[in-house]
Amino acid sequence: MKDEQKQEIILYGYRDSLMLYDEGLSIDDIKEVLQLYEERELYLTCAGIKLAIDELIDKYGNDTFRN
């Protein structure tokens, strides 16, 4: 797999996670999504999801429930 393809998969996980957050999922919910991808060994997507989680925690804190 080419580096461009790998980067595209990582960005997919990142953007999709941010979209899920914008649609109302909590960071904990997104962590559960991450576990599902880890179980399926889709590690490039996991990398993107982890980037999004880290960014969301930095920006909003580690919310268990959305307000």
What are these regions, as identified by a protein language model?
Residues 38-41:
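Hydrophobic/aromatic side-chain positions at a characteristic register within alpha-helices
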